[in-house]
Amino acid sequence: MKRFVPRLALTAALLAGVFTGAPNLAFAGNLPAAIDGSVAIMHTNDIHGSYKYSYNESKGTGTVGFDGLAVLYSAQGNAPDLLLDAGDTFHGQSFATMSEGKSIAELMDTFYADGYDATTPGNHDWSYGADKLRTMTGSSTTSTPFAMLCANAKSTSGVWSSSITKTLNRTWEDSESHSTFAYQIKVGVVGAMDESLGSSLRADLVAGTSFSSAADAINAEAEQLRKEGCDVVVCIAHTLDAKTFATRLRGVDALIAGHEHINLNEKVTGADGKTIHVVEAGSAFAEVGLLSVPYEYDTKGTESTDDDTVAVYAGKSDEKLYTAKDVNVLLTDPNKGSTYQSILDEVHDNKIKPLDDAFSAASSEVLGTSSTNYFYGENASGTHGWEMVRTTDFRPSKEGDTTKAQTIGHVICGSYLDLTGADLAIENAGGIRGGIAAGDVTAGNVIAISPYGNTVETWTMTGEDFLAALEHSLQISDECNHSYELQQAYVAAGHTEQEAQDKYKWRNDSGSVLSFGGINVTIDWTQPESKRIVSATLTKDGTALDPAKDYTVATNNYIITNTTDFPTFANATKHTEWSTCESAIRALIGQNGWENKMASLAGTISFGSAAVDPTPTPAPTPEPSPKTDATTTKVITKKTTGKLAATGDRTLAVIGACLIGGIVIIILGIIWKRRR
C-alpha cells in the first residue's frame, strides 16, 4: 500500500517539540477539557474537462472553473484543509481529451495554493488506458502532486494508491492570557470506484486491471488508517448510488461522491451504525462543495497531548454549495472585488491561458480532407443548421436530390460504427452543432460538430425497439417540419425569424430527432406515424432489419437515457463505454478514404411509396371474364372502392330501382299471407 507524504506537513525543526506530544511550555492559560474545531474539505466531481470561469448574468448560471475555484478558495476565512475530487475529471471537453487529460492534471496540481490533494477515477477517466490514468500525477510540475486513489483496483503493470494521510496543525488561544495551545488532527483519505462501473469499460483499456468490491476495500483501508492514528476518515468514491453505497461502509466519517451528477447532501447510517455525511456537487464545474466536519479534541485537562482523543460528529457536519453566481458576487464586491479579480486574472493568465494557447494550436491540426460538403444547415457558416438537422435533413431536397439526407448525421453515425463495430448507430439533433465543408478538415472543425464531451456507448436492443424509436423520431421531425414551414412563410411575409419562432414554436423535444446509421432506409412521408419506414436493410450484410433480433447500437451517452421520448430504450442493455464522440469523428476523418468508408457504414435514406405485397408465387390463374353478347357493365360499389357508385347511367338506375321495388312487394305479400 503506497502512502503519500501529507501535503502542508510542517517540516521546520523549530516546531518539532510542539507537535510530537511534548508539553506546550509556552502555554500559561486555563486549558479547557475539550476544544471544538472542524475539518474543512472543498470538493468537486464530474467536471468532465470543464476548466475556466464563465458567468451569464441574465441566466444566473455558469462554470466555476479552476480560476473561479481559486477565488472561492481564497474567500474562506481559513483556507480549506483538503481539496478533493471524486472522478470523471480528465475526460470530456476537447480541452481535456486532446491532451489525454494532462491539461486538467496540470491545472489540478498548480492552479492555486497547493492544488488538489487527491482524486479517484471515474468511469470516463479510463478512456486513455489504465496505465496513463494511474500515472496521471506524472504530469505534475511540483514536488507534491495530487494523489490518484483507487483502493479496489489492481493492475499487473503497477500499484494503485489506496489512501493518503494529512496532518492538520491546530492552535487554541486563551482569550484572557492569549496563550496558545498547539495540537494536531490527522485525516485519512481513501478512494475507490464502484466495481460495477468497471464492467462497462473497454476491455483493451483496462487489460491487466481488475476491480474488487469497492466497499470492502474502503472498509479495510479505513480500518488501517484508524490504526495509524487518523482521527477523521474521508472517502472519495465514484459510485452508482452514493447513499446506498454509504450504508455498506465502516469507519468512514464522510463520503464525497461522484457519477450521479446531482447535488447531494444527506446523512446516512453506515454499516457500523455511525453517521456518514454523503455529499456530491453536481457536474461540469457548475458547483463546488465545502464540507465542514466538526470534532471535539479532548485535552484531558493537561498540556500533554500523549493521551488526548478526538471525537468526530459527522451528524452535525455542514455542507455548502458554491456556483459561478457566488464567484460573480465576490468579483463585484465593492470592498474586496478587486482583490478577487486579481486572483482570477492571475490564475487565468498564468495557468489557464498557456494551456488554452496550446489547445488552440492543436485545434488547427489538419486531420484529413473532404471532397464534398457535409453541412450543418445551408452552408459552411451553419445557417439554419439548428433547424435543418431537425427537419429538412430527413426529407428530399428541393432540387430532388435524395442522396444527401442527414449528411452530417451520417458522418457522425459512421464514425461511431467505425469505432465500435456496432450494427446500428444513432445521434440526436441536439448533440450536433457544426458541419464539414469541402477541403481540409481540422481538429477544430470536428470539435465544433460535437462540443459537449459526450461519450460513445454500445447498447443491445431489438430491431423492433430500434424501429419504434426511429418512427417516433420521424414523428417529432414531421411536427418540427410543419413549424419550420410556417416560420419560413411568416418570415417571407416580412417578419423576423425570432418573431416567426415565437409565433410557431418548436416542440420541446425537438433535439431528440435522431440521425441514424448502419441501415439503408426508405421513408414514406405520406404514411402515418409508426408506418413511415417502409424498408430497412443493414449495411453490414444487406439483410432486412429483423424486429425480433438483437442488435448492437452505438450512441452517445446522453440520448440513450431519454426513455421519455423513446420508451423502448428502457429495454436496452448497456455494454461498453468508448471514447468521446468528438474523438470518434477525429479518428474516422484521419483515415485515408474515410468518406467511402463512412458512406458504406452509414447507409442511405431514400424516399418513396409504401411497399406493396409482392405477387404470390406461383401466381394464381385469373378467372375468365364473363362473356356476353353485349358490352359487360362493371358495377362499382362502395364496398369495393370505399366510394359511392358513379351515377351516370340513368336507364340502369331506373331498372335497378324497379327490380328492387318488385322484390320488396313480393316479400311483404308473403309475410302478410303467413300472418293471416
Question: What spans do the regions from the language model cover?
Answer:
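Acidic, metal/ion-coordinating pockets
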Residues: 29-323, 403, 408-411, 579-580
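C-terminal low-complexity, Ser/Thr- and acidic/Pro-rich disordered "stalk" regions positioned immediately N-terminal
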Residues: 607-649
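Bacterial N-terminal signal peptides
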Residues: 11-21
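A short C-terminal boundary segment appended to hydrolase-like catalytic domains
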Residues: 295-440, 589-612
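Feature captures C-terminal
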Residues: 35-40, 50-54, 59-64, 144-152, ...
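C-terminal membrane-anchoring or membrane-association module
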Residues: 657-676
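Sec-dependent signal peptide cleavage junction
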Residues: 19-35, 642-652, 671-674
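Bacterial N-terminal signal peptides that target proteins for export
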Residues: 1-9
